[in-house]
């Protein structure tokens, strides 16, 4: 399988550069299993599309202002993107500079303080910060929000709120789980009234999510690592949902990645079952992989040739996904992080397109 198998052409003007005024006003392309027709709805219509007893699972990670700027002793400019916090004063980071900094070198930070390069960690660097407060708190004032590179503007005050989900609580991501950006408190209240239950996982989206696939043969691709936590409470919620005939709906690819990473074969469940898990995942989901943990997913539109595009093709089928993307482009949907969303149903869900 090749990277080029997941390419599509997208008019640049369809890349959303800013969020809509209302989160739930985003459009929602409902994609039932073939041959049912697609449905053009809005995210605020989700209560009509789900059933009492269904379980929506969100990623509760919170984005940190992870971008910093500084200067080497030589005078060369440096851009730092924090990939993961490693305690109160250390972090794993990406560094952009004309020449790679050496271990022991010190970067003077524009926001004040210094960062010492401890060494390499694969494609990343390890930094120790000399700052007055723990890094997590210091970044709230000193860091800049790391908007994706396809958003061609500087982050503004509005992004501090809008590039964060309303249920974000576990600090550690450098990019938002963007499917969750569409949910606001009024929509969550209407879903509760409908009888839909909520669960949460944590997956700290890392800087690797911005990196393109650099090889054409996908069996040569090395997937980036991310830390996640699927707790016992969520596992029990899923078990109860299945027992009563409800459906499990992931809000975002990060939730699918979390649940599939926590899927384990046991003697009692030879096909596998969800189990509590906390740790790193490097799972790479592409066509040929069977996603077992969810019946549906809410997800944004993904970049051509990205691992996220490959994941949704694994879930709904490549032909079906490409047909949906062509429909979305023709209907002028907005793409990527601040864009519109899809509701993808798996092949055995038995649902329609939500059109009356």
UniProtKB/Swiss-Prot annotation:
GO terms assigned for molecular function: S-adenosylmethionine:tRNA ribosyltransferase-isomerase activity
Keywords: Cytoplasm, Queuosine biosynthesis, S-adenosyl-L-methionine, Transferase
Any Gene Ontology CC annotation: cytoplasm
Pathway assignment: tRNA modification; tRNA-queuosine biosynthesis
Catalysed reaction, written as an equation: 7-aminomethyl-7-carbaguanosine(34) in tRNA + S-adenosyl-L-methionine = epoxyqueuosine(34) in tRNA + adenine + L-methionine + 2 H(+)
BP-aspect Gene Ontology terms: queuosine biosynthetic process; tRNA wobble guanine modification
Compartments where found: Cytoplasm
EC number(s) on file: 2.4.99.17
UniProt subunit comment: Monomer.
NCBIfam families referenced in this protein's UniProt entry, alphabetically: PRK00147.1, queA
Similarity section: Belongs to the QueA family.
Function: Transfers and isomerizes the ribose moiety from AdoMet to the 7-aminomethyl group of 7-deazaguanine (preQ1-tRNA) to give epoxyqueuosine (oQ-tRNA).
Name listed for the protein in its UniProt record: S-adenosylmethionine:tRNA ribosyltransferase-isomerase
The encoding gene: queA
């Amino acid at each position: 399988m090749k990277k080029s198998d997941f390419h599509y052409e997208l008019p640049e003007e369809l890349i959303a550069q800013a969020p809509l005024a209302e989160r739930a006003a985003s459009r929602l392309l409902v994609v039932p299993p073939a041959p049912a027709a697609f449905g053009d709805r809005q995210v605020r219509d989700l209560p009509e599309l789900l059933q009492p007893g269904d379980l929506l699972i969100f990623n509760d990670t919170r984005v940190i202002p992870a971008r910093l700027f500084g200067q080497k002793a030589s005078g060369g400019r440096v851009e730092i993107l924090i990939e993961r916090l490693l305690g109160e004063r250390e972090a794993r980071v990406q560094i952009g500079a004309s020449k790679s900094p050496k271990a022991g070198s010190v970067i003077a930070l524009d926001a004040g303080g210094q960062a010492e390069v401890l060494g390499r960690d694969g494609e990343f660097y390890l930094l120790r910060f000399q700052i007055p407060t723990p890094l997590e708190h210091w970044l709230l004032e000193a860091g800049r929000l790391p908007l994706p590179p396809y958003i061609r503007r500087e982050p503004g005050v509005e992004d501090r709120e809008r590039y964060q989900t309303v249920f974000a609580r576990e600090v550690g991501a450098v990019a938002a789980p963007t499917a969750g950006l569409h949910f606001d408190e009024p929509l969550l209240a209407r879903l509760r009234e409908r009888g839909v239950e909520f669960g949460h996982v944590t997956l700290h989206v890392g800087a690797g999510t911005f990196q393109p696939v650099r090889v054409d043969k996908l069996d040569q691709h090395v997937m980036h690592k991310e830390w996640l936590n699927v707790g016992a409470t969520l596992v029990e919620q899923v078990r109860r949902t299945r027992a009563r005939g409800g459906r499990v709906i992931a809000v975002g690819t990060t939730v699918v990645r979390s649940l599939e990473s926590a899927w384990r074969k046991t003697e009692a469940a030879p096909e596998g079952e969800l189990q509590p898990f906390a740790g790193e995942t490097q799972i790479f989901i592409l066509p040929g992989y069977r996603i077992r943990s969810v019946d549906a997913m809410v997800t944004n539109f993904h970049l051509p040739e990205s691992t996220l595009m490959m994941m949704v093709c694994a879930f709904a089928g490549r032909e079906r996904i490409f047909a949906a993307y062509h429909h979305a482009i023709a209907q002028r949907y907005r793409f990527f992080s601040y864009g519109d969303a899809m509701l993808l149903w798996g092949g055995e869900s038995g649902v329609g397109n939500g059109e009356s």
